[in-house]
């Protein structure tokens, strides 16, 4: 029987970055290849009804070993890693019995995980921690979640004395580019409720996400020879700068926390003739979320009025909504996860997700899906790390949740 660390280290060797630019499903071929490998592993450990569809969704069933009817529960994680940093040739290192000091990730490039910048790592002093070599992300988001779920399923299969109802397992592609639930067949999955294992540090239990939208701003300039440009040229670069500065300077990710929302400028492509700005818009409060969408549109209108012509076009598209609306209708799914953590000596930390998970969309598709910790920190970057004990406890948590549902 493989342990969770062995599985995790094997999974991160496979580059499964998703792509913002691709229109294929999944967005990268490597995700589909990884999905097939996971399907084979699920069959090998004894799960039933294993399927891998053409879109890369993996589903499987652990059959109930009790007579009474209890809700079928699902455990879900995503296979892709973020396109924000390379996931190719990940070279992890295990820092044994972490001593509480800065960790040199890459001596040659002077890349150091510093405790004054990432003080949360001190919570894991004395534990074994998996880190990167400074060149790539680690992939704990969310291959730690996959490793934890499969390890828990194998444990339940090997320990039939632990009673449980029907358990559904699901692995999704393209979560990191906001498409993880696009082709998820809730009816086929067959769960009454589910949990994603896509959270951060040990103890995190999340039933609130942002309301989310994206905005594309297209600016049409007019290029004229600079020597004769007076009253003729419209420099789209400068108009883009004006647009950026008309949004609140403090309502950005780097200056907000907790329940505060923001506008996040993802990218700028600009030259005199044309410019494109790509934003994401986030807020927990639905009313404030709607106001933010109107606010960014209003900036475009004001600039058009100033130039007395339509040079700015703002297109806003909703991405997902705060799953709290749906989770509150079946609050017991959170209560059971809370009790399960307490039962295995984990202090639950109820926090809002300053982001989204597949569960955000799935909850609005009829599958209430709060989020559990997967154990990692500093996702999407070279300073990502995951304590081994956190992964082990996450796998234990999955087992305990299944057990508590059987005893309801």
Swiss-Prot record:
Its cofactor is Zn(2+). It is an enzyme of class 3 (hydrolase). One of its GO terms (molecular function) is tripeptide aminopeptidase activity. Binds 2 Zn(2+) ions per subunit. This is Peptidase T. Keywords: Aminopeptidase, Cytoplasm, Hydrolase, Metal-binding, Metalloprotease, Protease, Zinc. Cleaves the N-terminal amino acid of tripeptides. CDD domains: M20_peptT (cd03892). InterPro entries: ArgE/DapE_CS, Bact_exopeptidase_dim_dom, Peptidase_M20, Peptidase_M20_dimer, Peptidase_M20B. Its EC number is 3.4.11.4. The gene is pepT. It catalyses: Release of the N-terminal residue from a tripeptide.
């Amino acid at each position: 029987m493989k342990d969770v660390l062995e599985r995790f280290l094997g999974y991160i060797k496979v580059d499964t970055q998703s792509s913002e630019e691709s229109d294929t499903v999944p967005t990268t071929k490597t995700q589909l290849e990884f999905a097939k490998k996971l399907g084979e592993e699920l069959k090998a450990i004894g799960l039933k009804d294993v399927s891998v569809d053409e879109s890369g969704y993996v589903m499987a069933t652990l059959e109930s070993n009790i007579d009474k009817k209890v809700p079928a529960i699902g455990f879900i994680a995503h296979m892709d890693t973020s396109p924000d940093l390379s996931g190719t040739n990940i070279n992890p290192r295990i820092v044994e019995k972490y001593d509480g000091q800065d960790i040199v990730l890459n001596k040659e490039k002077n890349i150091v995980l510093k405790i004054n910048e990432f003080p949360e790592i001190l919570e894991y002093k004395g534990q074994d921690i998996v880190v990167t070599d400074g060149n790539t992300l680690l992939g704990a988001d969310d291959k730690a979640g996959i490793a934890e779920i499969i390890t828990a399923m194998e444990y339940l299969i090997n320990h039939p004395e632990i009673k449980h109802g029907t358990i559904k397992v699901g692995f999704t592609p393209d979560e990191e580019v906001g498409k993880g639930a696009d082709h998820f067949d809730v009816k086929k999955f067959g769960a009454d409720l589910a949990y994603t294992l896509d959270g951060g540090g040990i103890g995190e239990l999340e039933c609130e996400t942002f309301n989310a939208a994206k905005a594309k701003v297209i600016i049409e300039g007019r290029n004229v020879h600079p020597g004769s440009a007076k009253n003729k040229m419209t420099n789209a670069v400068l108009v883009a700068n004006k647009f950026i500065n008309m949004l609140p300077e403090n309502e950005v990710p780097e200056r907000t926390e907790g329940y505060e929302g923001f506008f996040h400028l993802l990218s700028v492509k600009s030259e005199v003739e044309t410019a494109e700005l790509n934003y994401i818009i986030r807020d927990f409060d639905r009313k404030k979320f709607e106001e933010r969408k109107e606010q960014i549109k209003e900036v475009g209108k004001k600039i058009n009025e100033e130039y007395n012509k339509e040079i700015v076009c703002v297109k806003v598209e909703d991405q997902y909504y705060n799953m709290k609306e749906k989770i509150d209708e079946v609050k017991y799914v959170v209560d059971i996860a809370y009790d399960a953590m307490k039962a295995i000596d984990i202090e639950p930390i109820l926090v809002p997700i300053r982001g989204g998970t597949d569960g955000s969309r799935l909850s609005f598709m009829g599958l209430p899906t709060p989020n559990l910790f997967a154990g990692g920190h500093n996702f999407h970057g070279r300073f990502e790390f995951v304590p081994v004990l956190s992964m082990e406890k996450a796998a234990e948590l999955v087992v305990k949740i299944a057990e508590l549902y059987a005893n309801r």
